[in-house]
């Protein structure tokens, strides 16, 4: 009986088959529902993702199209600067227009009197038509300026295209005004001879006055200034500093333009570069005077060039008792030497805002001498001598001699083991380097030994006097002005010559037929040095400069030859 009772209780306790199936069915329905919901969520997420991709793609495409269609597309900070410009020059422009109208009224009165008394009326009618065109341009300029100011004050993204269109119209009007003013250009004559210097100075002063006061030109130069800022990654603290830099840039830009246009005797051209927003005072601050090297240090650690190579045949032939004789050195050495063509000169590097030119000149010299000796060009560390050479002042200046002295006493790391930062580091990290190069001594060269030293040793570290004329160099043979003080170090990598009529401006390595030039009188030949700078490949002729010299290379132009050293491996 008990067993039967337990079996009944067990039977009642077990769930029926129907209940089990119902539970399973409910579970499956929940699972299907969850799967469906997840699928819906996934589908919605996919749709949102696709919409986002399309949106950003279209936005990017539209932005690129706008940039392609209009290279003068304005940004908010550009609009802000233009607003300040317009406000600043508003009164000046009104004054110019009033003066212009008064002058035109006086001229009209004079012309009317002349017309009444003069039989030749054709020229007067022509002058009246020119003035009426100029008045029309000025009135149109006023209207456009007012419209431009209206859009600038709104300062939103939607007006960018319209702002840019107006800017283009303003620039076109400005060109028309300048074209009309060419009819009134002056010719500067002294004793019936064209005075180029006078024309350059007077023309420069007149154009500077006009450009400085005319708001249309300031808008045009603002556009060029924005392009300059973008190309050279210029960032200023605030609008006041930006305006100050803009004024400096504008003056430098006009100076560059006038040099290229008016200075016909110059053998070189200028261009805008990373220094175009530097004032003369700022350049002096950046290019500090190089450290002085006392004579006792030179005597203690360096070897005179003639003593270093005293057994050399050329030394004995062209130097008597340590002094240069009168023999023509070019009877034994080539008239053109360019170590770039021999593959032992690295491409110019960029020292940045750090005053480390001395490090780049000396380390570049070690690289070239090492490559000349070992047939293998390596890159060594400028940053190491900036951080570790205690005789130098890091980014605050130095001298190639002290850089060589450091390597003589400590060796030098490879560049990839001690990378350049363009700033001083508190610690010297040369202990991390595995491979180093060492020097045995330092060579010293006199100004009348440069040609021979280049041929026998290789590239040389030299110092020059840099000013605002020098830094704006673009191409050609530089024969401009230089600073009296030596404030910059470069690497002398060769020399050359070219017939004046064949001097051309380009950024490629130039070679010339020396046999042709040898038949030319000296007055018809331009002699030059080839120097490697440390202001990047964008400066000068792919980072290099051709600098004027005399035939024997001993005229010390721009200071080349005063302090010359080289590493002895």
Curated annotation (Swiss-Prot):
GO terms for biological process: positive regulation of development of symbiont in host; proteolysis. The keyword Hydrolase applies. Residues 1-332 form a propeptide. The keyword Lipoprotein does not apply. GO terms for molecular function: cysteine-type endopeptidase activity. The active site is at 357, 488, 533. Residues 97-118 are annotated as: Disordered. GO terms for cellular component: membrane; merozoite dense granule. It is a single-pass type II membrane protein. Pfam families: Inhibitor_I29 (PF08246), Peptidase_C1 (PF00112). Contains disulfide bonds. It comes from the Eukaryota. Disruption phenotype: Normal growth during the asexual blood stage. Normal invasion of host erythrocytes. Normal gametocytogenesis. Severe reduction in the number of oocysts in the midgut following mosquito infection with gametocytes. Glycans are attached at residues 58, 98, 121, 127, 479, 487. The chain crosses the membrane at residues 36-56. Optimum pH is 6. InterPro entries: Papain-like_cys_pep_sf (IPR038765), Pept_asp_AS (IPR025661), Pept_cys_AS (IPR000169), Pept_his_AS (IPR025660), Peptidase_C1A (IPR013128), Peptidase_C1A_C (IPR000668), Peptidase_C1A_papain-like (IPR039417), Prot_inhib_I29 (IPR013201). Its EC number is 3.4.22.-. Residues 1-35 are cytoplasmic. Residues 57-569 are lumenal. It is found in: Membrane; Cytoplasmic granule. Able to cleave native host hemoglobin; however, hemoglobin is likely not to be the physiological substrate. Cysteine protease. In the mosquito midgut, required for parasite development. This is Falcipain-1. It comes from Plasmodium falciparum (isolate 3D7).
